[in-house]
């Protein structure tokens, strides 16, 4: 059996809702759905994610809306970033943010979860948003490079775990590398 993992940069979850993203959720209902650029306060994210649960249930993907596991990290800078992750698979663990990054600009950019596949394997899935840098603004570039360095460290940890027989990892997102 395979699982479906989808990633979407929604460019604002409230705008995506106005455009009918909940209909897409009900039609496609991926096993894991990584979302970037949520750009909304927690209350708005919670209510929209609840609607996604109803869409998954209506589509027959889950028995009840509460069976859709939702996690997100809003950005502490209003109107910026924000990542989410929805899954109907069993959640084994959740982690928010990257270790060592505590500045507001680094919030809402990384969440990961360990899920159990129908075959019983555990995998790590991360929803990632790497902000765009701008060489005209050295501070923003320094922030981006610091985030990328920390992300590379975490990616190395995930790689090493997989190489030693541990969980495989899937990173989904908007990486803004160029």
Predicted segments, located by residue:
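Short, flexible loop segments at the rims of nucleotide/cofactor-binding pockets, characterized by
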Residues: 8-15, 101-102, 142-146
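Short, acidic/polar
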Residues: 14-26
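Structured beta-strand-rich core segments of catalytic domains in phosphoester-bond hydrolases
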Residues: 39, 44-135
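A short secondary-structure junction signal
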Residues: 136-141
């Amino acid at each position: 059996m395979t699982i479906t993992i989808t990633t979407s940069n929604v460019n604002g979850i409230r705008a995506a809702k106005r455009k009918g993203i909940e209909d897409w959720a009900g039609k496609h209902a991926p096993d894991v759905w990584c979302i970037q650029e949520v750009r909304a306060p927690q209350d708005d994210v919670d209510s929209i994610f609840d609607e996604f649960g109803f869409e998954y249930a209506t589509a027959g993907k889950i028995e009840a809306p509460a069976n859709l596991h939702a996690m997100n990290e809003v950005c502490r800078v209003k109107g910026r970033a924000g990542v989410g992750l929805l899954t109907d698979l069993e959640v084994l663990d959740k982690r928010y943010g990257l270790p060592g990054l505590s500045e507001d600009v680094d919030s809402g950019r990384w969440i990961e979860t360990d899920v159990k596949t129908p075959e019983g394997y555990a995998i790590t899935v991360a929803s990632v948003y790497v902000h765009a840098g701008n060489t005209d603004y050295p501070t923003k570039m320094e922030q981006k490079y610091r985030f990328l360095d920390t992300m590379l460290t975490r990616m190395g940890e995930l790689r090493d775990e997989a190489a030693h027989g541990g969980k495989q990892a899937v990173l989904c997102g908007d990486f803004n590398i160029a």
